[in-house]
Amino acid sequence: MKKFFTSESVAIGHPDKIADQIADAILDEVLKQDPLARSAIEVTVSTGDVSIFGELSTKAYVNVRDVATDTIKKIGYIEPKLGFTYDSVNVSNKIVEQSAEISSAVDQAEDDPDQIGAGDQGIIYGYANNETSDYIPLALQLSHKLMKQLKTVREAGDSNSYLRPDGKGEVSVEYGDDNRPKRISAVVLSAQHIEGIELEDLRARISEDIIAPVLPTELVDENTKFFINPSGLWSLGGPQADSGLTGRKIIVDTYGGAAHHGGGAFSGKDATKVDRSGAYYARYVAKNLVAAGLADKLEIQVGYAIGVARPVSIDLDTFGTEKVSIDKIYSIVDQVFDFRPLSIINQLDLRRPIYLQTAAFGHFGRSDLDLPWEKLDQVEKIKALLAN
């Protein structure tokens, strides 16, 4: 029986991603002044409007409107004909201070006075597989690459580009009997574009400029299906056509549907929120275990209680691909990794302004960025323990 897997990504100018980028841009500006700030910022974008709300406790002063409009400008919403532009949007700031009760629960963990407690209860997941050099599914890797290429081509064309900021991409991969990628079965790409372009010309240019440079030729055959702007012309996009909200692209942000998701989003949250820091650390653990050869793919689930440092549970799933006993993997995890929030923050150095760069094209598998949770710096330690 044939096995297929599909993942999607969205462009930097997708409404939900605009919201994520604004939230993380604000977070980064706050962290530049106050590394100990507590943040849980949410953003909505719609026709002519940006609303920023949530909780923030900090000594920093940040001009939220300026950060929001500068972010929108950098994304590419500049031309008046786009409807939603950096210099015309109404920005409302409804941020309030974090609850004192939550703050006191986090400041000192109930079970470990030297640690901070988890910022909330939550279930988080980390995942890695070895089918790509980035340790993420091939379908997701290619979907992100298509969206990066869309941005590159649009920005290279500057004001003469036929592309506009919004877009979506999707790749389907067929697997062989060895559970390795065999071929690309389908590609879907929808790109916002200028008015006045002919549909067939648009499709030909997207095929040549965006798709061809990204797809591995050895995985494309005569039966690969391409759906380029399958709904037809798409000149009206972005928040002018569709509202956006932080945290609404959590599968794009993580593993493209290959792993479970606990439901917590990332953008706008500081590292005391285990939705973010715990998920980053779980990815770090899974990636190092797979890179060390303990399994071909691995998922880890971690459960937290608010105000408590140590996880209430840790569970592993290797999907039958383990190369050593599951008990041995658990033992290595226990010896090498510390899932307490403050330990995670210190080990990965998460009180820095590094988050805006993650708010588009995925938080994991980012070989184009120097992200601490993507480092393979525990592999040799894991291998040494394996040898004992």
From Swiss-Prot:
CDD domains: S-AdoMet_synt
Binding site for Mg(2+): 16
Catalytic class of the enzyme: transferase
Location, primary (coarse class): cytoplasm
Required cofactor(s): Mg(2+); K(+)
Membrane-spanning residues: none
Cited PROSITE patterns: ADOMET_SYNTHASE_1, ADOMET_SYNTHASE_2
Superkingdom per UniProt: Bacteria
GO MF annotation list: ATP binding; magnesium ion binding; methionine adenosyltransferase activity
Signal peptide: none
Pathway as given in its UniProt record: Amino-acid biosynthesis; S-adenosyl-L-methionine biosynthesis; S-adenosyl-L-methionine from L-methionine: step 1/1
BP GO terms, sorted: one-carbon metabolic process; S-adenosylmethionine biosynthetic process
Stretch list, region Flexible loop: 98-108
Family as reported in the entry's similarity comment: Belongs to the AdoMet synthase family.
Listed name of the protein: S-adenosylmethionine synthase
Organism: Oenococcus oeni (strain ATCC BAA-331 / PSU-1)
Gene transcribed to yield this protein: metK
